């Protein structure tokens, strides 16, 4: 590749105004340092009014989005970057939107034949107009207890709760609606929780070793995710080879069904009989010190910084067409 076709600075974009701002900043700092360790020129930027001017002032920039939640994962950022004709790492706007919205991604996965929990998406207006009492009874019959209640459009398990009885459901719904106007109520799957990172390199989609998650709390919530010592991680997960392969295949299938690109992380629960159930895929997985994706990279024997650099190079090559 000659000089005129080489990319310029890598703009690691982190922060934003979502509920996950602090996690995003931590992810951004880690990716920035990893890329600098590879000798790459990095510019760190928040999502603010000066971003477009910054991108226009750089020669052939490549954006590495580390925004979590909101415009970073719902396709909004990708649409702007397409408008500016700027290369970026990660999924397209449409694919990011599909995976971020659990009311869309879950049904798509189920329609494609992937094992998923029984689930219902309920807009806040519907919950309010029809009345909590009637809906609570119907949800109990359809989904059963215990159940999981979470916002349709949020990450890091914000607004997510486990509901063991009907009396707890209204408060859980209110908690989920605090993060968006649609809540997803889904069957609680009892089993081993694992995360499987997926990367695309040289046209090949690869699943990295599964990370087993053992939180101190009842569910893998925000505190368990980002507080050191609150969760035990087993890497690679303590799964038999056939079950580990089934999890890897499921993660890759979800990546492809949702049309994701470059990298993703599938959240999976393995039932006691060894059957993996797909919960959701994240198109912009966290990269903090306690995040699952970097742990999987390390377990695979890969260099995290080199992988980040390869993802940038792939994004630039794709941009050139």
Language-model segment annotations:
Residues 2-8, 111, 240-321:
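ATP-dependent carboxylate activation and anion-phosphoryl transfer catalytic cores
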Residues 7-13, 227-236, 292:
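A short small-residue
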Residues 75-82, 220-227, 283:
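Short, flexible, mixed-charge acidic loops at enzyme active sites
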Residues 1-14, 42, 57-58, 98-192:
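Active-site nucleotide/adenylate-binding loops and adjacent lid/helix of ATP-dependent enzymes
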Residues 164-249, 270, 275-277:
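Phosphate-binding site of ATP-dependent enzymes
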């Amino acid at each position: 590749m000659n000089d005129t076709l080489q990319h310029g600075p890598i703009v690691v974009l982190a922060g934003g105004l979502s509920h996950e701002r602090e996690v995003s900043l931590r992810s951004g700092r880690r990716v920035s340092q990893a890329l600098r360790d590879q000798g790459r020129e990095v510019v760190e930027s928040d999502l603010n009014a000066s971003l477009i001017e910054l991108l226009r002032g750089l020669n052939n920039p490549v954006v590495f989005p580390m925004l979590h939640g909101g415009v970073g994962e719902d396709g909004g950022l990708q649409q702007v970057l397409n408008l500016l004709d700027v290369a970026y790492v990660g999924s397209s706007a449409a694919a990011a939107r599909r995976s971020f919205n659990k009311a869309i991604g879950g049904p798509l996965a189920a329609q494609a034949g992937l094992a998923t929990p029984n689930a219902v998406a309920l807009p806040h207006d519907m919950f309010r107009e029809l009345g909590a009492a009637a809906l609570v009874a119907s949800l109990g019959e359809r989904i059963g207890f215990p159940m999981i209640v979470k916002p349709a459009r949020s990450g890091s398990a914000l607004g997510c709760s486990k509901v063991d009885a009907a009396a707890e459901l209204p408060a859980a719904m209110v908690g989920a609606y605090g993060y968006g106007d649609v809540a997803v109520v889904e069957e609680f799957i009892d089993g081993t929780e694992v995360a499987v990172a997926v990367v695309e390199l040289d046209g090949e989609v690869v699943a990295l070793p599964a990370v087993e998650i053992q939180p101190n709390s009842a569910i893998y919530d925000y505190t368990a995710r980002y507080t050191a010592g609150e969760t035990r991680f087993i890497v690679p997960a303590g799964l038999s080879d056939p079950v580990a392969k089934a999890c890897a295949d499921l993660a890759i299938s979800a990546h492809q069904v949702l049309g994701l690109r470059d990298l993703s992380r599938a959240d999976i629960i393995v039932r006691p009989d060894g059957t993996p159930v797909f919960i959701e895929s994240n198109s912009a997985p966290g990269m903090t010190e306690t995040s699952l994706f970097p742990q999987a990279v390390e377990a695979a024997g890969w260099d995290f910084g080199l992988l980040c650099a390869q993802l940038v190079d792939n994004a630039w090559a794709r941009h050139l067409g």
